[in-house]
Each structure stands twice: as C-alpha cells, then as structure tokens.
C-alpha cells in the first residue's frame, strides 16, 4: 500500500522535498532517473532527457529508512558543497525543496573515481540499493 502521510522526520518546511538521482547519457539524450518524495514513495523514469518527468510509481520505502536517507543526502551535500564533473555519462544526486527555495545538485563522471566524488558515489550506491533489480 502507498503511504498517505509524510515521514515523521519531515517538518512543515520540508513537505515538498524531493530527492532525485540517476544517470544521464548525453550522447544518447536519455536519462534513468529515480525520484523519492517525503512519503518515501519512489518513482522511476527512463527516457528522453528533453521529456523528463517524475515517472511512474515503483515502491514505497519504509519511512524510517527514508528519514535516514534524507539525513544522509543533506549531510553529504553539506560535506561536498560543489561537484560538477561531466562526461558523456553523468551520475547525479539532487536535493530540491521548493518551499524553502533550496536546490542542490551534484554531478560526476561515473567512469572516473575522483577523491572529490567519493562521498557522492557512496551515497548513490546506497540510494541504488532501494531499486529492485529487473
């Protein structure tokens, strides 16, 4: 069943928070994107970068797990501050809260393992564990 309430760790100012991550394939013009809202609902979109959307509902993450992940994402952004290293493929993590006008995005080349991208790569792997294998 889909959750009908936001996770208990979510404040009034965080209700609209969205966490996104995925891989953009610039040469193909495609993206594989995952979006998680404050209810812990996970949405998947695979397709054209130009037509990007939140995608279809995939699953609901346990709300305690959501709280841990949201905290980890914010901590990682506070630690990393800025990361924008693109290649023909680019991995990314976004933290977006429209209500408080916060938009954070880290982008890195998954074909390179740089010191600067280490924390984001680890966080990306942690987020990808939520995605069921096809």
Regions found by a protein language model. Give the residues of each.
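Short, well-ordered, aromatic-rich surface patches in folded extracellular/luminal domains
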Residues: 1-26, 76-134
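Well-ordered beta-strand positions in beta-sheet-rich domains
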Residues: 31-33, 56-58, 105
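Structural signal for glycine-centered tight turns and loop->strand junctions in beta-sheet-rich domains
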Residues: 38-42
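Residues that act as N-cap/strand-start positions at coil-to-secondary-structure junctions
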Residues: 28-30, 53, 87
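Short, solvent-exposed loop/hinge segments that bridge or flank secondary-structure elements
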Residues: 25-37
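A short-motif feature that recognizes glycine-rich, charge-decorated loops
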Residues: 43-79
